[in-house]
Amino acid sequence: MQAATVLINRRALRHNLQRLRELAPASKLVAVVKANAYGHGLIETARTLPDADAFGVARLEEALRLRAGGITRPILLLEGFFEADDLPTISAEHLHTAVHNEEQLVALENAELKEPVTVWMKLDTGMHRLGVLPEQAEAFYQRLSQCKNVRQPVNIVSHFARADEPQSGATEKQLDIFNTFCEGKPGQRSIAASGGILLWPQSHFDWARPGIILYGVSPLEDGTTGADFGCQPVMSLTSSLIAVREHKAGEPVGYGGTWVSERDTRLGVVAMGYGDGYPRAAPSGTPVLVNGREVPIVGRVAMDMICVDLGPQAQDKAGDPVILWGEGLPVERIAEMTKVSAYELITRLTSRVAMKYVD
């Protein structure tokens, strides 16, 4: 009997990288593998994508794990470095780093490095989280251009705040600021992440940075799924039935008795709960697949178990397979039902969920 297991489909991952090349044919791709590759496993994901032009991570520790795992492709520190003492390691490991504030710039100017570092100056075009403000950007850029520890030319990166809202006008404004600053500068440019790749072809530039869409999940919250863009789900969260029970009409189920059956039926108990990372907020009616057919969750999600209404004539039995999301049941549907973003669902599975890679 299978306990909670997440299946990672390597073939789908490779397919998605190729599909993104088709969507952004003039761009090189930074495969974003931060946060344990969005819950898919950092090292195995990178090893599955040897043709990625580079990898993007949030922390130096992630980059060093990739290097220790044999990954030799360029690795970009999307948040830059946190301490000046990190710079010798960044140089020695040939990492690329974002630079987005005065403290980082001063650290670069003062460092004693054996080799210069490839730098991506982060321009704040409207996200207002990290980055150099446009009115300060030219002077910042000139200092980077004159810094002995920076491999020239300086590259320029930014990030969209509302790429998933094509009617907002915010993305066009960010693009205008980005294009104005980059004009005449020789470095590489990058602003498009998943939403930019899908909706804003004019933003693809030299490098694009696919994140969640690389894993077959739509970054948009408009009812679309990764399949709508030609991508395949890489992660399937699976488990099995551990019991099947007869249940009488009028009887409640689970903590608080929040669901009461209107008919005699058969209930299945699934070895999955919020202790595995499944959302406790999932309401009755949230779908799962049992033996390939859709059935609803009933009652509250518990730490270790959920109950599903199999139907009065169901022939399912203990040990039968269950898919909570993934192949045949897009995680975007679960996100819509639970009001928990797909980003959070796929990255928050706990350590007791086994991970298995399949082709």
Swiss-Prot record:
GO terms for cellular component: cytosol. Keywords: Cell shape, Cell wall biogenesis/degradation, Isomerase, Peptidoglycan synthesis, Pyridoxal phosphate. InterPro entries: Ala_racemase, Ala_racemase/Decarboxylase_C, Ala_racemase_C, Ala_racemase_N, Ala_racemase_pyridoxalP-BS, PLP-binding_barrel. It holds the Pfam family Ala_racemase_C. The keyword Cell wall biogenesis/degradation applies. Pathway: Amino-acid biosynthesis; D-alanine biosynthesis; D-alanine from L-alanine: step 1/1; Cell wall biogenesis; peptidoglycan biosynthesis. It comes from the Bacteria. It catalyses: L-alanine = D-alanine. GO terms for molecular function: alanine racemase activity; pyridoxal phosphate binding. Substrate binds at residues 129, 303. Its cofactor is pyridoxal 5'-phosphate. Catalyzes the interconversion of L-alanine and D-alanine. Provides the D-alanine required for cell wall biosynthesis. Belongs to the alanine racemase family. This is Alanine racemase, biosynthetic. It comes from Escherichia coli O6:H1 (strain CFT073 / ATCC 700928 / UPEC). The gene is alr.
